[in-house]
Amino acid sequence: MEIANLKVYNDNMRKSLLDKAYFLSFVDSDTFIDFGCADGSLLKHIHEMFPDKKLIGHDISPEMLQVAEKNLEGCNVSLYNNFENVISLKLDNATLILSSVIHEVYSYGDNQSVNEFWRQVFNENFRYIAIRDLTPRKSIDRMSDINDVSRVLHNANPTHLAEFEA
């Protein structure tokens, strides 16, 4: 996946930061692993709340990891481009965070990469797996109306549409 504007993408992802961190008070982990950490904003937030926890970020984008490295300066965070390296750490009490990555895998990956993603997720190393709940409202019981979609396409910021596919 190529992101045209990292700043716009990361700014939009940060808007839901508190939702993504909601689970923190419900798990007792020594380590938090953000799979698809982007610019590291969630890891930075966790570090501010729990400075003694071990934090690990993973992203397949070298550009994102460079931004995360700058954003996380002074935080005790390890960043990885290859998730197999994270798995090899053999962490006993770790929470794997999947806050904004599942839709990316399905949107941009093929069947093989989707299967590989789930193989990595369900590795025995993780005590908890935190998935941000993005269930639709109960009132949604139909396909999107083409007029609604057209209205969104007409009124939306073109940069946002480029970053978040309709």
Language-model segments: what does each one mean?
Residues 86-91:
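Short conserved loop adjoining the S-adenosyl-L-methionine
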Residues 35:
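Conserved beta-strand/loop positions that form the S-adenosyl-L-methionine
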Residues 38:
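Conserved glycine-rich SAM-binding loop
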Residues 41-76, 81-85:
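Class I SAM-dependent methyltransferase SAM/SAH-binding core
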Residues 10-29:
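Conserved alpha-helix/loop element of class I SAM-dependent methyltransferases that forms part
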Residues 128-165:
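Conserved class I S-adenosyl-L-methionine
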Residues 97-98:
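A conserved beta-strand element that flanks and buttresses the S-adenosyl-L-methionine
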Residues 105-121:
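A short, conserved alpha-helix within the catalytic core of class I
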